């Protein structure tokens, strides 16, 4: 069994954590994140550490405990270091470009596909075939990258499409003729 909830969260010196009831605000050099958590958890903030304490050992409290600790840790990492996901466009004529802050993808459709970044998300394009999604919220970065990938997911026969960097695409053989 995982013991994620019992780990103490180390808070860097340039990050401040503010706890008001079940609302936690984390401020750092890259920005600020606020989130409301379950009422049952309590928090111990001492020096540069934060500990999440559960009221009992019931199954629900144990699961909420681990999830809460992981989410707070992601908030602390996000405002101090940030998160990024890299996507690769593979296919003839597939390319990405920035128009202002918007991402425009040409991926084999009759029209270009445009993405407007949500608050706290930035796009960078390298070599026309690599897109980086950066931000302070791990959840938002992952969801945005997933939405971009969903425009043209990699297909198994030729491997064309948008994929995460390092993603393995299982290839299939085409049908054999007579």
UniProtKB/Swiss-Prot annotation:
Organism of origin: Staphylococcus carnosus (strain TM300)
Entry similarity comment: Belongs to the universal ribosomal protein uL6 family.
Quaternary assembly: Part of the 50S ribosomal subunit.
Transmembrane segments: none
HAMAP family named in the record: Ribosomal_uL6_B (MF_01365_B)
Gene transcribed to yield this protein: rplF
Protein role: This protein binds to the 23S rRNA, and is important in its secondary structure. It is located near the subunit interface in the base of the L7/L12 stalk, and near the tRNA binding site of the peptidyltransferase center.
Keywords, sorted A to Z: Ribonucleoprotein, Ribosomal protein, RNA-binding, rRNA-binding
A Pfam family matched in the record: Ribosomal_L6
Keyword Signal: no
Protein name: Large ribosomal subunit protein uL6
One Gene Ontology cellular component: cytosolic large ribosomal subunit
NCBIfam families to which the protein is assigned, alphabetical: L6_bact
First and last residue of the signal peptide: none
């Amino acid at each position: 069994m995982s013991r994620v909830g019992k780990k103490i969260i180390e808070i860097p010196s340039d990050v401040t954590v503010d706890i008001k009831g079940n609302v936690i605000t984390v401020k750092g050099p890259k920005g600020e994140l606020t989130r409301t958590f379950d009422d049952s958890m309590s928090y111990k903030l001492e020096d540069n550490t934060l500990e999440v304490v559960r009221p009992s050992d019931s199954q629900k409290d144990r699961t909420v405990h681990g999830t809460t600790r992981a989410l707070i840790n992601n908030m602390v990492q996000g405002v101090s270091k940030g998160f990024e996901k890299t996507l690769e466009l593979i296919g003839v004529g597939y390319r990405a470009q920035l128009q202002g802050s918007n991402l425009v993808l040409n991926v084999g459709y009759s029209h270009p596909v445009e993405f407007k970044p949500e608050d706290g998300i930035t796009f960078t394009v390298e070599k026309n075939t690599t897109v980086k999604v950066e931000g302070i919220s791990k959840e938002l970065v992952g969801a945005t990258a997933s939405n971009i990938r969903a425009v043209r997911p990699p297909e198994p026969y030729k491997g064309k499409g948008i994929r995460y960097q390092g993603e393995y695409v299982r290839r299939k053989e085409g049908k054999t003729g007579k």
